[in-house]
């Protein structure tokens, strides 16, 4: 197979591991910076061009698109989909997952338990918004933030009002969420491929920090998840239409709560913690899906 990895930086751990896994399974791989792509959009002969050349068709595309380039990155991914390439995660699902508010609304509609979350526009609603999520302490999140950036713990009502007003002064869209005390700065990252949770780790925030993201100095350990946690992680990924997802879960007294679903989960933390070859599992999943596509096309052609 010919596989394209859409990424701005091919030296990142996840990109290198995916390339190694694909090449070890005898596939050819090209890492493509989506911002260096340009597209010919027409019904007769659509194409993707890259640094002065027209790209040949790829059998599969793996999107590793940063949140800052979601709009253009998913446009490029969509063009590859038009050309018949199999997307590990399709453009619609990636966009869905990147919109934190929309994704939470979709998860809630499917009955998936979440931290109590508020969203408002008018400054006049700040007081009731804080009360609606259970009061302080609470968490204020930028809708467009990633890796723990733009996430603030407000320990008092006055602090919460100040943080919310400051973000609004920047014309930023924010979510206000209850702070789950019993989680104690920990969360569970479930790595979903298809209909399986293939790995799970527990992430612990460093001392003096409440965000458990490994990028912010948190630590990780292998963890055994419950059947309920496994089921909710798979359902969350499926609800957003993702074949591969990192589903972050808080262990609350009332049961597991889905905090976030990541469409481009990093491999370094989970592979080094569990010792599992997640990259190889992802390539194997692509092989299975593309083989089924070929088989289906062959059957249709004969009918």
Curated annotation (Swiss-Prot):
Keywords for the protein's UniProt record, in alphabetical order: ATP-binding, Ligase, Magnesium, Manganese, Metal-binding, Nucleotide-binding, Protein biosynthesis
CC cofactor: Mg(2+); Mn(2+)
GO MF annotation list: ATP binding; metal ion binding; ribosomal S6-glutamic acid ligase activity
Residues in ATP-grasp domain copies: 104-287
EC number of the protein: 6.3.2.-
Binding site for Mn(2+) 1: 248, 260
Residue numbers binding Mg(2+) 1: 248, 260
Sites where the protein binds Mn(2+) 2: 260, 262
Cysteines paired by S-S bonds: none
One GO CC term, this protein: cytoplasm
Binding site for Mg(2+) 2: 260, 262
Annotated binding of ATP, by residue: 141, 178-179, 187, 211-213
Xref: Gene3D superfamilies: 3.40.50.20, ATP-grasp fold, A domain (3.30.1490.20), ATP-grasp fold, B domain (3.30.470.20)
Cofactor: binding details: Binds 2 magnesium or manganese ions per subunit.
InterPro entries reported for this sequence: ATP-grasp, ATP-grasp_RimK-type, ATP_grasp_subdomain_1, RimK, Rimk_N, Rp_bS6_RimK/Lys_biosynth_LsyX
Record GO biological process: protein modification process; SOS response; translation
Annotated Pfam families: RimK, Rimk_N
Family: Belongs to the RimK family.
UniProt name for this protein: Probable alpha-L-glutamate ligase
